């Protein structure tokens, strides 16, 4: 049985909020643009209790496979590959507990939701505002047909979508307004954990609007077929909007580094942020992994699992913090990379450049004991850090990010392929993510990273064009040691 959520009238026009709800201008990645031109959207509704929302994009559709522009049309269905992806997502989420499932009513999304939801006893809740972006005359066209028929307009859609008007409409701005309305219904629905199954663009808009990011972030936070993104909403006193933390972005059923394109475009340049493995102090509830703390057994396993995952890539250089846990993680990755060329019949030894970067080092002053282990692993834990320490980390992250970007070549020749792996503490990597997205220090608690996780940033337009975030806090490669999608309400002490 399908239950339909009511659709309210459109919300005010485009603007975005920084954490805390104030409207402010922002720039996309490394490009300097002023896009904050309109009144602020209404804030997220206040919450009485914490809520986790898991966003999943539908599996591959027939029009995905054909390279045809879908928009909000409802002619495509899941391919056999798409059905398989949805089944993999079902298995990935099988042990996770959800109180409700919202879905786009379009066939490709609805079918994905049906496969994932499976035998759960509650009804799916279709919401028409969760449909894919409305692309009007572009819908149904193959991409080369769009170029031939619409020329400059199609090029504008590719290069500057937030300012592109199609048939008198601004699709991205309309999408952002729709997403804001969806949050009103999703967050006021009862339950602590909600699954949302929808589409690429609308899921991007949901992530962005929850964090207060404007339309300039369209195509910056990637959503792959059946990729899962997790958002945590924490109630605030005085009826204020909840604080929001992106716990992970685009955790895909398959490896996040196997794809060679980013937002439909190939990318030969990539930075992979690897959070060092766990140490004894981090396992005991401290902001560990600083100074001389070595990896514990869990950290060794995490480092080896990450090294295996990165075998899908040819890593050119590994840049790590000089601290022991980071160096141990880097060494494990380097040894596997260099041995990979000799695993087949033809032995071709490889050399991977490995060097230390002081900017990735975390000072011993950050070794702060938390009240419990749960505090250090929960979303938004950076929000509890002393302001001066946060400020120090933020200043440090600027030079570190620039040093990593400088490792990428500007030219696009055959020799320009470059994969840089940066290894350090989750705290400094949070600063690097915010630098990539050209955000302020206040956004650092809006993201979360776990020990042993990876985050992938692609540069399809080169380092000067800014980064596209393919995924953050990916831990599926850790197998039985991966971080589950939903939080268990039982055995918290054991966790």
Swiss-Prot record:
Phosphoglycerate mutase-like protein lacking PGM activity, but having 2-carboxy-D-arabinitol 1-phosphate (CA1P) phosphatase activity. Can dephosphorylate the closely related compounds 2-carboxy-D-arabinitol 1,5-bisphosphate (CABP) and 2-carboxy-D-ribitol-1,5-bisphosphate(CRBP), and 2,3-diphosphoglycerate. Prevents the accumulation of D-glycero-2,3-pentodiulose-1,5-bisphosphate (PDBP) a potent inhibitor of ribulose-1,5-bisphosphate carboxylase (RuBisCO). PDBP is produced during the oxidation of ribulose-1,5-bisphosphate, the substrate of RuBisCO. It is found in: Plastid, Chloroplast stroma. It comes from the Eukaryota. Transmembrane segments: none annotated. PROSITE patterns: PG_MUTASE. Optimum pH is 7.0. Residues 1-50 form a transit peptide. Gene3D superfamilies: Phosphoglycerate mutase-like. It catalyses: 2-carboxy-D-arabinitol 1-phosphate + H2O = 2-carboxy-D-arabinitol + phosphate. Residues 1-23 are annotated as: Disordered. GO terms for molecular function: 2-carboxy-D-arabinitol-1-phosphatase activity; phosphatase activity. GO terms for cellular component: chloroplast stroma. Belongs to the phosphoglycerate mutase family. Inactivated by oxidized glutathione (GSSG) at pH 8.0. CDD domains: HP_PGM_like (cd07067). InterPro entries: His_Pase_superF_clade-1 (IPR013078), His_PPase_superfam (IPR029033), PG/BPGM_mutase_AS (IPR001345), PGM_Phosphatase (IPR050275). Pfam families: His_Phos_1. Residues 1-12 have a biased composition (Pro residues). This is 2-carboxy-D-arabinitol-1-phosphatase. The active site is at residues 58, 132. Its EC number is 3.1.3.63. Keywords: Chloroplast, Hydrolase, Plastid, Transit peptide. One of its GO terms (biological process) is dephosphorylation.
């Amino acid at each position: 049985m399908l239950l339909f959520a009511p659709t309210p009238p459109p919300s005010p026009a485009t603007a975005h909020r920084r954490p805390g709800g104030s409207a402010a201008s922002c720039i996309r990645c490394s490009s300097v643009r002023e896009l904050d031109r309109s009144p602020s959207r209404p804030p997220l509704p206040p919450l009485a209790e914490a809520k986790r929302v898991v966003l999943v994009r539908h599996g591959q559709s027939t029009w995905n496979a054909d390279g045809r522009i879908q928009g909000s049309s409802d002619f495509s269905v899941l391919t056999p590959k798409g059905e398989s992806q949805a089944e993999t997502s079902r298995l990935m989420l099988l042990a996770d507990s959800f109180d409700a499932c919202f879905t786009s009513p379009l066939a490709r999304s609805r079918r994905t939701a049906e496969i994932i939801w499976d035998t759960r006893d509650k009804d799916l809740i279709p919401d028409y505002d969760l449909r894919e972006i409305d692309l009007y005359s572009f819908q149904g066209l193959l991409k080369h047909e769009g170029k031939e028929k619409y020329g400059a307009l199609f090029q504008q859609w590719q290069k500057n979508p937030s300012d592109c008007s199609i048939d008198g409409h601004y699709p991205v701005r309309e999408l952002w307004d729709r997403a804001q309305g969806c949050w009103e219904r999703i967050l006021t629905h009862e339950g602590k954990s909600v699954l949302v199954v929808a589409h690429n663009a609308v899921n991007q808009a949901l992530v962005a609007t929850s964090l207060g990011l404007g339309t300039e972030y369209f195509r910056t936070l990637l959503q792959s077929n059946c990729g899962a993104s997790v958002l945590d909403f924490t109630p605030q006193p005085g009826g204020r909007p909840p604080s929001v933390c992106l716990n992970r972005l685009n955790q895909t059923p398959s490896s996040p580094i196997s794809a060679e394109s980013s937002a439909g475009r190939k990318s030969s340049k990539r930075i992979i942020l690897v959070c060092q493995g766990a140490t004894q102090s981090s396992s005991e509830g401290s902001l560990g992994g600083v100074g001389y703390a070595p990896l514990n057994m869990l950290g060794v396993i995490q480092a080896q699992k990450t090294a295996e995952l990165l075998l899908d890539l040819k890593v050119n250089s590994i840049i790590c913090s000089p601290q022991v846990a980071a160096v141990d993680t880097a060494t494990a990755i380097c040894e596997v990379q260099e041995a990979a060329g000799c695993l087949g019949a033809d032995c071709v030894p490889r050399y991977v450049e490995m060097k230390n970067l002081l900017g990735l080092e975390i000072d011993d002053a950050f070794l702060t004991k938390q009240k419990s282990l749960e505090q250090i692993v929960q979303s938004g834990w950076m929000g509890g850090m002393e302001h001066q320490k946060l400020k120090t980390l933020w200043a440090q992250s600027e030079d570190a990010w620039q040093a990593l970007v400088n490792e990428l070549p500007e030219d696009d020749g055959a020799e320009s392929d470059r994969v840089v792996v940066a290894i350090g503490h989750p705290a400094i990597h949070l600063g690097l993510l915010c630098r990539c997205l050209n955000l302020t220090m206040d956004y650092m608690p809006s993201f979360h990273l776990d020990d042993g996780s990876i985050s992938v940033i692609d540069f399809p337009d080169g380092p000067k064009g800014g980064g596209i975030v393919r995924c953050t806090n990916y831990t599926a490669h850790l197998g039985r040691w991966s971080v589950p999608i939903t939080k268990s309400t039982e055995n918290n002490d054991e966790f």
